[in-house]
Amino acid sequence: MDIAMAEKNTADIGFEKQIWNAACVLRGNLDASEYKSVVLGLIFLKYISDRFNDKYRELLAEGDGFEEDIDEYTSEGIFFVPVGARWSEIAAKAHTPEIGTVIDDAMRAIEKENKRLKDILPKNFARPELDKRRLGDVVDLFTNIQMIEHGSEKDILGRTYEYCLSMFAEQEGKRGGEFFTPSCVVRTLVEVLKPFKGRVYDPCCGSGGMFVQSAKFVENHSGNISNISIYGQDSNPTTWKMAQMNLAIRGIEPDLGTYAADTFLDDRHPTLRADYIMANPPFNLSDWGADKLKEDVRWQYGMPPAGNANFAWLQHMIYHLAPTGRIGMVLANGSLSSQSGGEGEIRKNIINADLVECIVAMPTQLFYTTQIPVSLWFINKQKKQPGKTLFIDARKMGTMVSRKLRELTDDDIKKISDTYEAFVDGTLEDVKGFCAVADTEEIEKQDYILAPGRYVGIEEQEDDGEPFEEKMDRLTSELSEMFAKSHELEDEIRRKLGAIGYEI
């Protein structure tokens, strides 16, 4: 999900890059959004084929003749791959002119046998723009993958899928990166919320990153992935399909609705009350259908402005919370202080309802797609510290991993989640410039503005032990030397200009 991915195994990262480089060769004259489905579709096809083959060999060895019995596979969550669609048959035709049609037919056959995949898999490999010789080379590369060398097959293909998603997001930039939330941002939300069991919901789920990280969290803490149930929605049909494939690779069975749909105008989970809601909605979405939703039951704290959906997203999520539910979401910083279109009043009402548990101001340059500064909002219907809100200023955190991109390190994420834990436990002490706890009265005095900088203050400078008088004597002496040096340089420049006939 991230270029320098969470839980990366340095021995394996070259493999992901190898796949990506092959994908770049495939691109030819396709644009990124088109070849995205080609590459991700191939990864998915290889994944389900390999899972099927493992089980097929196991059944063959048992010798009871059940290797073509679809129930033997579906009962273990394995997709059934019919004759004609198996990777060995695709590999055998890798360098024939009809390889694109062979893959398209395989995708159709797999969809037909597996209802969960209906209308989800890409079937555009036969198109003339796709170089069939290069496509055959990529099929060869996938055929020759030695999974044993690369650790768990599910993990390596899942990570490859995520790696390619991140690279597509970087390439597409503002035009197409909305489907992707950087891993370090998702992991921060997950590490604070700790979704061990219950219903997890993302109303704008993109490619499913929140769900993948939630499942990883459960697995990393020796939990059972079946203890969480996944609900999501996305309005973009291509992205919705990518999420379905991404989650299937991870062995996660989500309910993403029966089709891609607009969350505000066509809520696919109207009765859902979730235990954990995690989301990175589109920032400052302007045309969100406000005129059709004026009396909507979700706007408990005020009608969101037609020109900005930020508080529509927040209220939609609050509406879908279970009585003990919690939210972790990304919002543009404008939402911390905006007074326009009634946003100030909505924010005031949400604060006075004692729902805002924590605000984290995030560093810049975390996203491929925008330079808009963002914060994380954590909402809790049953706060352990009633009447209090934690403010964390994390703007100085993170490490630049490229000229344009910053990431939070594991230590950064741990520091944020540990600070939150200490606040919940009642053991947190304010740290100037980093974290502070404020009660509702203090927030009211600040006109209900939630910018952490207003509450955490300025970081204390370390005392270097040098007495003030001595420091001033030293600094003024150094300054005097610099002035003298500057006069010498000025005289030298005047002399040199005079020598060539230019007097100053």
Report each predicted region and the residues it spans.
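Active-site lining segments that contact anionic ligands and/or coordinate catalytic metals
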Residues: 273-274, 298, 308-310, 324-326, ...
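Hydrophobic alpha-helix feature that most strongly marks membrane-spanning transmembrane helices
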Residues: 219, 248, 252, 282, ...
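Non-catalytic, mostly N-terminal accessory regions of nucleic-acid modification and defense proteins
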Residues: 1-196, 255-268, 361-364, 386-402, ...
